A protein has these predicted regions:
Chain A
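ABC ATPase C-loop
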Residues: 233, 238-240
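Charged, flexible cofactor/metal-binding loops and thiol motifs
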Residues: 21, 81, 309-424
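Conserved ABC ATPase "signature" region
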Residues: 76, 196-216, 325
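The feature captures the beta-strand-to-loop junction immediately N-terminal to the Walker
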Residues: 44-46
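P-loop NTP-binding/switch modules centered on Walker-like glycine-rich loops
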Residues: 250-251, 255, 259-336
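Conserved hydrophobic segment flanking the Walker A/P-loop of ABC-type ATPase nucleotide-binding domains
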Residues: 35-36
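A short, flexible loop at the N-terminus of ABC-type nucleotide-binding domains that lies
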Residues: 4-8, 17-30, 61-68, 78-112, ...
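Conserved signature/switch motifs of ABC ATPase nucleotide-binding domains
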Residues: 159, 223, 240-241, 265
Length: 425, 173
């Protein structure tokens, strides 16, 4: 399998807990997914479902008392492998020594290099280059184990290869530095440009995210920007170093709908034209329909449904997803009141036995109290070991044949609303 | 209009007790971090005696399938801050018949030590409940058998853990 066939990011069995006096808060509990190059992947769920903690874990931004307890995060980018191998040769894995930088295929000017490419890279770190640059050793395939990487290596990855757009631009921007300086800082750090070149690129970035008169606005402070412009400045910081993956944590929650549409268009354009993968965290299913290719629904720190966006909207399989869908207000809807998912998210210190959703599920039976459903293929009922985006999977006993009465809901797709993914459940 | 700098709000005077002092170095010299001092001076053996542990269920008898609600209290008997060093980051744990959180699946807490801190004479109260179902596997539970069950609470302290435990019993009928 060549490197481009493999997903850019694989998250496998991720577990993150916060140890508080109340007990262990299991914020992320065995989450697996993968994102391909240029794919737009959504993580949706209520507040407290573990969406943001999942993203912060893969960026290694979990602070005490939080701990990433288990799992693997594999990031397959040859440029990331090349940069890290050059700067941290001691982290390159060889046949005899472990490491977090794995070089699986290496070429030199004369052809493919020996049986242990890791050792070759470790011995010649200065020669390591990607195929884009001149150099005697080209890394053709490799990956980085993000959770094992050193703190210095993570600082190289963050912002450069994996960028994050934070939820609230007011707190993400530093009020005492100009907006331009905050963008230029990331460029100077990662792209090793001098002050003048970094400023030029920062202005280019501001123009790109649609800030008018970017040259003038470069030296404005964040308070001189409107909310939408601040969010665009945060996006400009994220884009400034041409990342391979952008993790966007509710990027449009603080914005009005017209600016939201512009920001979504910008993210779409980036992923289409530059093959940037986007992991979008949101609780707005409308945004998911607008932007994303595939989606994972989370509940109480676990994935409950995973599928392509079309299948999720037209054929939701998990009762929680159905509940979320039916709580979306729609124009022309003649219902007196919106349906809601009754109750609240369970306390993550003591999760209910069996299926975590059973206390709120209208279809819950005795079996749901004693068996926790694994994520299964909804067609075959077979557990899904490898998170394959093409397989529609849901964690409900309905699909393992253990429910007696089954789940029973209708999805009606209205012709007039079908264009914006509208249906009522 | 009176400006803020005309208000003398920032007037500093060492002799006037109602205005900020010119030099606040003396104030910082008086500051003692009692938590750290107590942690340094109180012997380990006394620390585990200082904390009283108590656990109480809301009833003595429960129907099968009924949720068991209970309260846990940790009280610092000393008028000094006490810090207990724990084996794992988990400050305390409850168990049913010796199974942590009613689960036969072993817990997997990281093996790095942490601390459980009490201010002087502090009482910490926690409310918890148990569903009455024993976790027998990662994804399987079964109803608890009828009869007497023991609910235990303890701090997994590095020193004197045996003193930092409490137990109670209840019946499922």
């Amino acid at each position: 399998m060549s490197v481009t066939d493999e997903p850019l990011l694989s998250v496998d069995g991720l577990q993150t807990s916060f140890y508080t006096e109340e007990g262990e808060v299991k914020a992320v509990n065995d989450v697996s997914y993968q994102i391909d190059r240029g794919e737009r992947f959504a993580v949706v769920g209520e507040s407290g479902a573990g969406k943001s903690v999942t993203s912060l874990s893969l960026m290694r931004l979990i602070d005490d008392p939080g701990r990433v307890k288990g799992g693997d995060v594999t990031f397959r980018s040859t440029s990331a492998v090349a940069t890290l191998a050059r700067k941290f040769p001691e982290g390159v894995a060889t046949e005899n020594s472990p490491g977090y930088i794995h070089v699986t295929e290496l070429r030199s000017e004369s052809g493919a290099v020996g049986s242990d490419p890791g050792a070759t890279v470790r011995d010649n770190p200065t020669d390591v280059a990607t195929s884009l640059h001149d150099g005697s050793l080209h890394i053709e395939a490799g990956h980085v184990d993000v959770l094992d990487a050193s703190e210095d290596a993570m600082r190289e990855l963050r912002g450069n290869e994996i960028a994050m757009i934070f939820q609230d631009p007011h707190t993400a921007l530093n009020p005492v530095y100009t907006v331009g300086e905050q963008i230029a800082e990331a460029i100077r750090k990662h792209l090793e440009m001098d002050d003048g070149a970094a400023k030029e690129r920062a202005i280019e970035m501001l123009e790109r995210v649609g800030i008018p008169d970017a040259e003038e606005r470069y030296s404005d402070y964040p308070h001189e920007f409107s909310g939408g412009m601040q969010q665009r400045a945060v996006i400009a910081i994220a884009l400034s170093c041409d990342p391979a993956l952008i993790v966007a944590d509710e990027p449009t929650t603080a914005l009005d709908v017209t600016i939201e549409a512009q920001i979504l268009d910008l993210l779409k354009e980036l992923s289409n034209e530059e093959d940037v993968a986007v992991q979008l965290i949101t609780h707005d299913l409308g945004v998911v329909a607008e932007l994303c290719d595939s989606v994972m629904v989370m509940y109480a720190g676990k994935p409950v449904e995973r599928s392509s966006v079309e299948e999720l909207y037209y054929e939701p399989k998990h009762p929680y997803t159905v509940g979320l869908m039916s709580s979306i207000p729609r124009i022309g809807d003649d219902r007196e009141r919106l349906d809601t998912v009754p109750g609240t998210m369970p306390d993550l210190v003591q999760l209910p036995s069996g299926c975590s959703f059973h206390p709120r599920c209208p279809y819950a039976e005795d079996a749901c109290l004693e068996h926790e459903p694994p994520l299964v293929d909804v067609e075959t009922g077979e557990p899904v070991e490898d998170p394959d985006p093409a397989v529609h999977s849901a964690a409900c006993l309905e699909y393992t044949g253990e429910l007696q009465d089954g789940v029973d809901f209708d999805v009606q797709i209205r012709e007039d609303a079908a264009t914006d993914g509208g249906e009522s459940v | 209009m009176r400006r803020v700098y005309d208000s003398e709000a920032l007037r500093r005077d060492d002799d006037d007790p109602f205005s900020p002092v010119e030099d606040d170095e003396s104030a910082s010299r008086n500051h003692v971090n009692w938590t750290n001092l107590s942690h340094a001076l109180v012997p380990q053996a006394i620390r585990s005696r200082a904390i009283a542990v108590d656990v109480e269920t809301d009833k003595d008898r429960y129907e099968p399938g009924e949720e068991i609600h209970f309260g846990v209290t940790f009280a610092n008997r000393f008028p000094l801050p006490i810090t207990i060093v724990t084996e794992t980051p988990k400050s305390w744990e409850w168990s049913i018949d010796g199974n942590p959180k009613g689960s036969e699946v072993p817990a997997d807490h990281p093996e790095d030590r942490s601390t459980f801190h009490f201010s002087r004479s502090e009482r910490k109260r926690f409310r918890r409940s148990w569903s009455g179902r024993v976790r027998v596997d990662e994804k399987e539970w079964r109803s608890a058998e009828r009869g007497e069950h023991t609910l235990g609470v303890g701090i997994d302290a590095v020193n004197g853990a045996e003193k930092l435990r409490a137990e109670t019993t209840f019946q499922i009928e």
